[in-house]
Amino acid sequence: MTRPETRLVLTSATLLFTELLLIRWIPAQLVYVGFFNNFVLIASFLGIGVGILLSRRRPDIGPWVGSIPLFALVALVFSNQLNAWIPVQRGGEVFLGFSEGRQVEVDVAVLGGVVLLVTAAMAGFALPLGPLLASMPPLRAYSFDILGSIAGVAGFAALSALDTPPLVWFALLAALLLVQTERRRPTLATALGFAALGAVIGLAVLDQVRGDLYSPYYRITVYTPENGAQAIAVNGIPHQAMWPVAQRNPTMEPYYDEVYKLLPGKRFDRALIIGAGSGTDTAVALSHDVGSVRAVEIDPEIQRIGVARHPDHPYADPRVAVTIDDGRNFLRRTTDRFDLVIFAQTDSLTLVTTTANLRLESFLFTEEAFAAARDHLAPGGVFVLYNYYREQWLVDRYSRMLDDVFGRPPLIRSFPGHAVASVVIASGQPVAAIDPAPSGWSRPSAATVAAAPRPTTDDWPLPYLRDPGVKPQYVVALTLLLVFALVLVAGSARYARVPAGSFSLHFFVLGAAFLLLETRSLVTFSLLFGTTWYVNALVIAAILASVLLAIAVQSRWRAPRAFSYAGLFGTLALAFLLPPAALLVDPPALRYLLASAIAFAPIFFANLVFTGSFRETREADAAFASNILGAMCGGVLEYAALVIGYQDLVLVVAALYVLAWLFARIRWLADRALAT
């Protein structure tokens, strides 16, 4: 394989495939990494940038060297893998709780090791990228890089669609590296890389023997605890139990029956259960003679486990219809009305914490989602939430939101005898008519509702964050990460003899701005079409396709810089003035066209700006490295959404592009080569 274009496509495909693999695989084994999930993304960008720098000094080293830190990473992760139903104790800060009396602790040393080894592995895999970028005209190189990235996204999306295990993922990575091997005498680095990747495959085989299943979202383990009921753990966390309704101990999970006890004379002809899981909520509804149940579950593998293993076989009942979809998206699509709408245990089983990344249920616990549930109630219908909410302020927040949506505070049933209290929250016309509250139930006072934390909205969909802000542990971790990145980049540049004048502030800021713009697009489409894995994969592919379109335009027509910036700021203004909620129109085809125009137009013009500058650069590899390192800092800036929300993130993006324009005018360092 000698054609540089082919090698560039394969290198870029390998990098993006590996990045997605690590982002998907590591949190499935070490659940607390999921709370720092974009740290893996940031480390990946850092590693790619460092790899490009190092290739200036050692262009002869192939990508196999990245397999050595990858093996160390896999060994570290497996040796600290969380299986939380097994009693374990580790030192560190208590970070999340997931069931009665259990807690998981963050091992800071392991988290730091993960970041270090991800960076090292991605740097190794990126070593061929610098010479390949420098071997052809910049725009030609960039187009083949994007083609490879699209191939990497498509490959991993296909594996997710097929519910393949990590063994297949790592095997495909090995195949990608194998086809990049040059036909020449193997070096020591190549030999060690071969051996390391072989060891990775061996560890994946041993892990496969254990029998875990992998859905598009989770590592799933089916096990039998001491109480005898089959149970499901996701990413090592006990998640669901499959009890026969007739044998279920109501003191263990008391919330299932409460709405039926609250309204004993009411018949529910049609029920909607969002978060139906393996089927227990549905089985309980059927046991209370609910006429028909629409069971909505986002994870197809968990639902299939329920079909095969739930002792009551609720999904085999002709009264039950199953939909595999995001709950919010189902509410948007359906025109049906229901006598009972239940948001079952749809939120993740964690203590209050924050990440810059959306969770699967983020848009299900907003005022707009509660209003959508209300609008799908038949006359006299009831809306119910239940879960282990753990924090009183979270219950108060939901009470305030339901008061805003339904016009009266809900009825609440708590079970304080549990180590982590379970709570049932009910609203709707029949519930509002109950006065006074029955024994065991309560209705929050006006003062309690008024003092509750601010409601979550589609712009700030962060129910587990009490107040806007970034928690101290994230500030400390991000600071340490940036210091590590600064030292590593400076050291790598010095080792590779890359002069400071090769660094581009213009491309650095463009990278940070584009990462935030991409984040905003993903959030928009998650709201409009659901937080499913395939929506995200399609959005990423569409973003990359819009990049290719910009390259094609720039190759055939040298777009004036003023035109590119005017289009960019004009479309950013439109995106800011038309928030995603304004695009919630029917039919879905029209919604898709509007959303695509609003979300992808700024991306197109942003890439006209980038490609217009990139075609002028004298050092394509250094400019690309600057851009990738800027994207790493964009991953840090993403946490600003925890404070200002996702709509105002557009203003941050606009400010960064203004800064990029200024750096192009000032022409410091490598930006001297740019046209004014």
Where are these predicted regions, by residue range?
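Alpha-helical transmembrane segments of multi-pass membrane proteins
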Residues: M1-T676
